């Protein structure tokens, strides 16, 4: 599967953009700054909307879990960094984000969204794209939701853990795999060890 210039198994498109960092400061960051770490890079349509804060807060609240497995979560939308900051400074009870534990990237020229294939051109906003990029900068997973439905932090965390497991051990992860579950040796004979345990 490919999406814009984002192709599974290929280097993820690099970007350089201004982000609002967890300390509330503006900083120019690029994807290459995170080489050596896994990255969950997700797009959302707009600041000050309805589903978006639920997703962003959910990822931010669990940023430490991702950090523990050497993974950085980064959010992005087409809004300006000033708009991001205003939303962060708006209380949660008023639809704001409150303090963030993840950077929020500003993509006002829509070049990053276009590069990653998530730009909804007729509205100039991003679909809910999510990209898992490994520690070598290779794109491993793409999901894109239409605007009305949010994403699962649990599933994203599971996918990062599964890719990290396969990278380290060379075994493959069956459907619904979670850390500690059985994996499959990718060999006709050795795979029977896994399948023989199935009901």
From Swiss-Prot:
Sites of the Glycyl lysine isopeptide (Lys-Gly) (interchain with G-Cter in SUMO2) crosslink: 7, 120
Pfam families: 1-cysPrx_C (PF10417), AhpC-TSA (PF00578)
Domain Thioredoxin, residue spans: 6-165
Active site, renumbered: 52 (cysteine sulfenic acid (-soh) intermediate)
Chain positions of cross-link Glycyl lysine isopeptide (Lys-Gly) (interchain with G-Cter in SUMO1): 185
GO terms for biological process, alphabetical: canonical NF-kappaB signal transduction; cell redox homeostasis; erythrocyte homeostasis; fibroblast proliferation; hydrogen peroxide catabolic process; natural killer cell activation; natural killer cell mediated cytotoxicity; regulation of non-canonical NF-kappaB signal transduction
Residues modified as N-acetylserine: 2
N6-succinyllysine carried by residues: 35
Enzyme Commission number(s): 1.11.1.24
Region Disordered, annotated ranges: 176-199
Residues modified to Phosphoserine: 32
Swiss-Prot/TrEMBL catalytic activity: a hydroperoxide + [thioredoxin]-dithiol = an alcohol + [thioredoxin]-disulfide + H2O
UniProt KW keywords: Acetylation, Antioxidant, Cytoplasm, Disulfide bond, Isopeptide bond, Oxidoreductase, Peroxidase, Phosphoprotein, Redox-active center, Ubl conjugation
Chief localisation class: cytoplasm
GO cellular component, one term: cytosol
Family membership: Belongs to the peroxiredoxin family. AhpC/Prx1 subfamily.
Quaternary structure annotation from Swiss-Prot or TrEMBL: Homodimer; disulfide-linked, upon oxidation. 5 homodimers assemble to form a ring-like decamer. Interacts with GDPD5; forms a mixed-disulfide with GDPD5. Interacts with SESN1 and SESN2. Interacts with FAM107A.
Name the record gives this protein: Peroxiredoxin-1
Record lineage: Eukaryota, Metazoa, Chordata, Craniata, Vertebrata
